[in-house]
């Protein structure tokens, strides 16, 4: 039985090698067009470096968040209180939503007045339209104060 066991693996190895050889012949033919497509896009050695950088850029995709600023304001108002990551995410989404609404309203106002530029006046009017009552008044006063501080420095 031992000789038969030896013959079967020996018989299988050449059989496996032949399809592998056929696959090896077919695979390079299939890979050559792909390699040709990659070379013009990657441009040789520089392409491999760019591929790595592009990979890094995708990994380090910069996402603008307001988490730092939310945390700073929280510590100004309540120094002893923390915030969970879920609550922080909700606050970040809230701020993004408000800014989107303000930007959209400001753009509409600029279009209505046939002006190509959104100025502080459009922003101020958008704040009055989007935010309710006292909140709008406080936002306008804080915004005016911030703009004055920025222009004076």
Curated annotation (Swiss-Prot):
PTM comment: Can be acetylated to form H2BK6ac and H2BK33ac.
N6-acetyllysine, modified sites: 7, 37
Provenance organism: Oryza sativa subsp. indica (Rice)
Subunit structure: The nucleosome is a histone octamer containing two molecules each of H2A, H2B, H3 and H4 assembled in one H3-H4 heterotetramer and two H2A-H2B heterodimers. The octamer wraps approximately 147 bp of DNA.
Swiss-Prot/TrEMBL keywords: Acetylation, Chromosome, DNA-binding, Isopeptide bond, Nucleosome core, Nucleus, Ubl conjugation
Pfam families: Histone
Organism classification: Eukaryota, Viridiplantae, Streptophyta, Embryophyta, Tracheophyta
Full protein name: Histone H2B.6
Entry keyword annotation includes Nucleus: yes
Composition bias, Basic and acidic residues: 1-28, 36-53
Placement of covalent cross-link Glycyl lysine isopeptide (Lys-Gly) (interchain with G-Cter in ubiquitin): 149
Cellular-component GO terms for this entry: nucleosome; nucleus
SMART domains, per database record: H2B
The keyword Transmembrane is assigned to this record: no
Family statement: Belongs to the histone H2B family.
Function recorded in the entry: Core component of nucleosome. Nucleosomes wrap and compact DNA into chromatin, limiting DNA accessibility to the cellular machineries which require DNA as a template. Histones thereby play a central role in transcription regulation, DNA repair, DNA replication and chromosomal stability. DNA accessibility is regulated via a complex set of post-translational modifications of histones, also called histone code, and nucleosome remodeling.
Main location per the UniProt record: nucleus
